[in-house]
């Protein structure tokens, strides 16, 4: 899986009658964490327990990732989270029009979708073109879904994600009338005149004294 670089944003607005479950809005949510499995995907020296000394093992500053364990945890975590959110919404997987998952790994997404009984038409995938953009992946995938006409007014849309910790979350909502982006921008980034190695060298130079 290759990581991508991107950004996304979603703008919410209040609805006229929050008590009207037949109208647009959030129908069900689920959020959770399992610290017992945290060691399967972690950077040991980050956080309050990190070792800020020059004698630390450099390997502990890198991402430790147990691929097979993370695969199983992610698939099961997203399935259970989606089911709980749907249950709180009084719905089932048969009611879902589109799932927009965190684009971490296509195999994980397809495995979870298959076990939920979802067809390819019910799942938004864009990791093949954008890579894993981390927190930006769901808004970017939603943008692509809107651009390609895969979200219609009144659709039941599910967002679901998992991450380090390990953590997971899902949201079930009924889509409103707007099925196009708020607008487009012609803004452009300034040309980059340094390499990634040069940027990292500057970071190492800045942070090195903190580890002595």
Identify the meaning behind each predicted range.
Residues 1-72, 76, 80, 174-212:
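Condensing-enzyme catalytic core mediating Claisen C-C bond formation in acyl metabolism
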């Amino acid at each position: 899986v290759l990581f991508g670089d991107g950004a996304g944003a979603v703008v919410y607005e209040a609805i006229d009658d929050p008590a009207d479950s037949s109208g647009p809005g959030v129908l069900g949510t689920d959020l959770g964490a399992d610290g017992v499995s945290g060691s399967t995907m972690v950077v040991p020296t980050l956080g309050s327990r990190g070792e800020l000394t020059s004698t630390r093992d450099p390997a502990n500053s890198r991402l430790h990732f147990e691929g097979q364990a993370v695969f199983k945890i992610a698939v099961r975590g997203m399935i259970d989270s989606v089911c709980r959110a749907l249950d709180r919404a009084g719905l089932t997987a048969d009611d879902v029009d589109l799932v927009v998952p965190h684009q971490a790994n296509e195999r994980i997404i397809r495995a979870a979708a298959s076990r939920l009984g979802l067809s390819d038409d019910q799942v938004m995938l864009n990791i093949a073109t954008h890579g894993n953009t981390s927190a930006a992946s769901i808004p970017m995938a939603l943008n692509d879904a809107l651009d390609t006409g895969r979200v219609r007014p009144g659709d039941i849309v599910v967002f679901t994600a998992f991450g380090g910790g390990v953590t997971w979350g899902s949201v079930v909502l009924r889509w409103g009338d707007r099925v196009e982006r708020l607008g487009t921008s012609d803004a452009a980034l300034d040309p980059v005149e340094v390499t990634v190695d040069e940027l990292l060298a500057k970071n190492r130079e800045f942070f090195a004294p903190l580890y002595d």
